[in-house]
Amino acid sequence: MNLVYRVSTKSDIHKIYELSRNLIDEYEDIQNIDYEKVLTWVYKKIEGNIHEYTSIYLDNTLVGYYHFYEDKDKMELDDFYIFSEYQNKGIGSKVLSELIQTEKTIYLYVFVKNVKAIRLYERYGFKICKRFNKNRYIMER
């Protein structure tokens, strides 16, 4: 599998936002949040950090994104998405196996109900270290 990684650009903002919104719609407890405020915050976060995001391509086709950055003495894996039509093809596993090569501790937030993602992270040595809120775990490796 030949994956190509490119720094994301402004033209990617909307696609990343749509993936984020889809995850929020699927896994967030929407009745207990200010939905519009959360979506505005997510969009601004992506827009303000777009050049820290990485676009993942397979055969010149965009298949996903991730935001992996240093946070003090750790690394945070934030916004790791593979488009649904490309899931279960080994892409997420390949990307994750490359990202975990760092010596630093890596942490991430994952929706409690996102069992597929949790299982993937566990296969690569991540463990749930605490519940962040009702809907999210913090996992660490």
Report each predicted region and the residues it spans:
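Accessory recognition modules or surfaces
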Residues: K89, S93, M139-R141
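Conserved dinucleotide-binding and phosphotransfer motif residues
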Residues: E85, T102, Y124
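Conserved beta-strand-loop-alpha-helix junction that forms the acyl-donor binding cleft
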Residues: L108-R119, K134-R141
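Conserved active-site alpha-helix within GNAT-family acetyltransferase domains
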Residues: S93, K113-R131
